[in-house]
Amino acid sequence: MARYRRNRSRSRSRRRRRRRGGRGGRRGRRRRRHGQRRRGRRGRERTRRRRRRRRRSSS
């Protein structure tokens, strides 16, 4: 999976470097990747907590 993502980033980086520049493109990608990881972990934790609360209230 990691290799496939890197290949995609290289093809996109060439296009973005001409428009935004290498620095802006790299920073934007890093922020997006971290954001997805944090949202995924927080989202799973919240759903688990909500389900437990519903079960307790029903009991």
Curated annotation (Swiss-Prot):
MF terms in GO: DNA binding
What's the domain of life for this entry?
Answer: Eukaryota
Q: In the UniProt record, does the keyword DNA-binding occur?
A: yes
Question: Where is the region Disordered?
Answer: 1-59
Keywords, A to Z, come to:
Chromosome, Developmental protein, Differentiation, DNA condensation, DNA-binding, Nucleosome core, Nucleus, Spermatogenesis
Q: Which GO terms describe its cellular component?
A: nucleosome; nucleus
Reported function = Protamines substitute for histones in the chromatin of sperm during the haploid phase of spermatogenesis. They compact sperm DNA into a highly condensed, stable and inactive complex.
What family is this? Belongs to the protamine P1 family.
The protein's name in its UniProt record: Sperm protamine P1-type
Q: Which organism is it from?
A: Chrysemys picta bellii (Western painted turtle)
